[in-house]
Amino acid sequence: MGRRFARMKTPAEPAPQSAPQRGEMAWMDGSFLPRQSLFLPVGDAGFVLGATVTEQLRTFRGRLFMANAHQERLHESLQIVGIDSGRPLTEVFDAAAELASRNHAIGPAGDDLGLVIFVTPGDQPSQQRGMGGTPRMVIHTFPLAFRLWAHAYEHGVPLRSVSVRQVPDACWPVQAKVRSRLHYFLADREAHAAESGARAVVCHLDGRVSETSTANIAIVRDGTILAPPPADALAGVSLRCAESLAESLGLAWATRSLTEQDLADADEILLTSTPNCILPATRFNGRGIGTGRPGRIYQSLLAAWSRLAGLDIAAQARAQSESTDESV
């Protein structure tokens, strides 16, 4: 009697995704191309091993913000990981600026973009008949997801302690900005299970606070802003911007390792990251921080950041979030 096989089920329709805008471009290995033509082989070490160095920027009115600082950090990450991109980073960032300008011009009025540069080692020899490849470099843009954080400028975000820990320096230095982020994924899943919308505070094995999955952390205590040293967290471009703005405002800034108890006792908690610049964390493990509302120093830094960017950062996020909601 012949062997019987189960009838194969027709795969479900994939969930709808945001399609590239007409005319939207990307850049790969020195050439501009339509975004829908962008691809990487599944045998690339960036997928097979998660060996991907990355940098994320954002635009204000279509122009890249703090591009030089991001270029410096990408250079440092490539050196740490040992990937030679094969081309000058000045050329890469010139292409990034052009790509951002072109894609911003075809987007909705008042919108802005995120821009990602990533570099992989190229083909993984074990999946290419033992033949390695040359590094691949890609630049692409996407509309900033303002609806994810527009409310937080006014109401803040909750933070949660989690059991997941930062990757030890013995594995790779915290200063390498890479895509190997499974610990962030697991940390945020644990935080979300404890409190809807909460972000995880990721600590080192010895208890030092490092960062969240998407932001650097600083606190305010007795009028002084305290931020972790470079050994504890990725050198955030936005954190450096906040420090510069604090200096211009005459605000005290100091660097030292932080603990979760420091967060619990803080007058304010500040979160800095490229897409949203600066946000307040108003709860930690279910308890209010300070007054439970965004604090004075946060408000001062946000206002200074808006002046530097040339637009009201929070107002833009609210307006674009409302526009997105209406189009859904």
Where are these regions (language model features)?
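Glycine- and Gly-Pro-enriched alpha-helical subdomains that act as flexible
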Residues: 200-201, 208-230, 235
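Secondary-structure junction motif
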Residues: 238-239
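Conserved alpha/beta cores of soluble small-molecule-handling proteins
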Residues: 1-201, 205-208, 234, 243-328
